[in-house]
Amino acid sequence: MVPLGGCGEIGMNLTMYGTAGKWLMVDCGMTFADDNLPGIDIVVPDPTFAETEAEDIVGLVITHGHEDHLGAVHHLWRRFRCPVYATPFAAELLISKLREAGIEDDVDLHIVRDERPLELGPFRVTLIGLTHSTLEMQALAIETPHGTLLHTGDWKFDVTPMLGPVSDEDALRAWGAKGVRALICDSTNIFSPGTSGSEGDVRAELIKTVQGRKGLVVITSFASNVARLESAAHAAKAAGRHFALVGRSLWKFYEAARKVGYLSDMAEPLNDKEAAAMPRDKVLLLCTGCQGEARGAMARIANDDHPQVRLKKGDVVIFSSKIIPGNDKTLYQLHNQLALNEIEVVTEKDRPIHVSGHPSRDELRRMYEIVQPEMLIPVHGEARHLIEQARFGVKDCGLPEAHVVLNGDILQLGPGTPKKLGEVPVGRLAVDASGLVLTAAEMLQNRRRLSQNGAAMIVLVVDEDSELIEDPRVSLIGIAEGADMRALIADAERAIERELGKVNGRRPADDDMLAQTAVRAVRKVVRQANGRRPVTECAVVRLEEGERVAAADKWKEAV
């Protein structure tokens, strides 16, 4: 077992299993960039190891349609070019991504429509339907010459999932009876006691929460939760309201679900334009942006920046979601903005209108009892999640052993005693407009410096003897404003003249020496003024005798 993503972090899942000289890849997901990567939205696993083993990869099996499990396929597939296997719903989502990337016709995509095992080289893979917060989540029973692995993917036990079947406990029990060498198990909610709750209870609570409202009702939730979408539609119908979807990602998941046979009993939702023409007290909107994303519909609506939707005093916004760690500040700002506009805000803290799609401790214990694995391998979590599930499985639940693996570890699962064999290269790639770049690349380091310290640009116009024939020109970005900016620029330009005078007093300077001297002078002035160390660039323009060209114009040519 070699995890390339998802072990030591939540998101970006990619795991490889190897035996008999062949490799099976499970999932290929992305994660969202944080503030340390300015200008970057998406991060994917570094597939260097998979690329080196590309000829021996027998297939990529996708467990389900969440972005952290399939969102990197269209970015990375060219690196390993193996067949891809997915159920109809996940395949429908993936096809649109492959089409956008221009590789739809290149990828050998197999849509798995039944329970027949996949024969992939030395691996025999059987899909097991489990409940999750999106459709068609599949655990994988992976038979190998040295034992069977059960890779759970993301899952929970829910007797009323509302859309799709309940988790197939009979299949899990049957595999447990045959013998499971290792249970590779979701760790996301290891710190949550009890159970994760039922989608059926959320539906009932949403219906109650919407009843009796006078103004516009807005619900915001994760777009991929199709059962929650259907629950919002039921709440609208029960309250005598028209149901509308606002946000492209909601329409994407709705249309994918309809195309593969779900939501067939549900009336077509209105779009935002159609909803805007209806009486406000007769409409329920389901919107994207439950995490306060700047480009999500909810943030635009709250900021009165949406072309069709306007909130008024007395309306209500229902957040049928949890706050993902790291989004707290953004969401509280959104809540405050709504409150200031006298919009009622309802969250999961107020009413039970959200449940997780991942197992809490009682569900994990039940999974262990059903499967009875020889060993537990926690995945899908930060280090603290993995370590705690390993402890919980062995100390609290009596499993024989557990092993914590992090991205890049090579863990031998069999035959014989499990042991770490070494490590492979791992890392993160940022999805940039120019392509995939290492998150440690100089380009991104410069962006971070720009975002934190600002920038300074210098133009020097000199003659053949390196003497200034125009005053230095300095521009500062993101460093100061107004009078402070003008004073700082004046100080910087005087410092350049002073330092260049010292250099040319010794000997004629070349362009590099002039530029380095000017950069040092400006950085020193700025650092002394406000402690910043700006990204600083200098263009040196040499002119023939008698030539006079404005430095500002030449700057455009120089860069």
Predicted regions and their residues:
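C-terminal tails and terminal domains of large nucleic-acid-associated
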Residues: 507-544
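Conserved hydrophobic residues forming the short capping helix/wall of the S-adenosyl-L-methionine
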Residues: 98, 393, 526
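Short, well-ordered strand-loop elements centered on a beta-strand within folded domains, enriched
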Residues: 1, 24-25, 151, 418-420, ...
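A glycine- and charged-residue-rich anion-binding loop/surface
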Residues: 7, 31-35, 41-45, 56-57, ...
